[in-house]
Amino acid sequence: MARHHIALDPGADIAGFRDAARRLLASQIPPDDVTWDAQGSTSLFGEDVAANAAACMLPRGVVEMIQDVVCHRDSQRYALCYALLWRVQQGERALLEVASDPLVHRLLMLRKAVRRDIHKMHAFLRFREAGAGRFVAWYEPAHFILEPVTRFFV
């Protein structure tokens, strides 16, 4: 049974996930002992979770994978990302190179869906003039991609 409940803001809360993951890893809390809630309810960190945890060194590919997967709408995205971090910190630094690993395969599928959604927004979103130098457009993304996509349109 999970002893630690981590509440994050709705959407893609990469900063909240990063902070929580650092504390959990510093306290050596395995993924099976953590539940993740992306509905913004109150966090119930256990007393044994370090309040201030140092940054951990991760392969660039792991960081990039997490940044993409956190944007997916899958309710298990944070649990999957933390499982990846846990295994990398336990010595599997080249884990992302093992495409046959079930965790890696699932993460790759989530990343692919997010990147496809980003591509569709880049390719198909068209702005129309709404008068007086104002432009409007409509696109309903399948995932939480608005933040990473905004740089493209600015």
Where would I find each of the regions flagged by the language model?
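Extended, well-ordered protein cores
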Residues: 1-154
